[in-house]
Amino acid sequence: MTIKEAQEAVDRWIKEYGVRYFSELTNMAVLTEEVGELARVMARKYGDQSFKEGEKDNLGEEMADVLWVLLCLANQTGVDLTEELKKSMEKKTQRDALRHIHNKKLMA
């Protein structure tokens, strides 16, 4: 599925099952909540914390939840994420083309 297809699929789902998008500010709060849930799994899986009894390692599910809300925000604010990602990659390539090549911390 492309990013464009994902944006379209989310939009169809919202119109069919969700009635309407939550407000932009509500979705921003929901995105923050979902990023926190992703951070919790990351801390338990890769950090110093351990999973609580009954908690599951659902890293992919939490990432998908973050992506879902980001797609909602893009749709409701008129952002074409495919185009914006292309621009972001071009910007990073120009800005960072040589930035990390000689970083001794990255050479293991």
Predicted features and spans:
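Flexible "arm" and connector segments at domain edges
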Residues: M1-M63, L67-A108
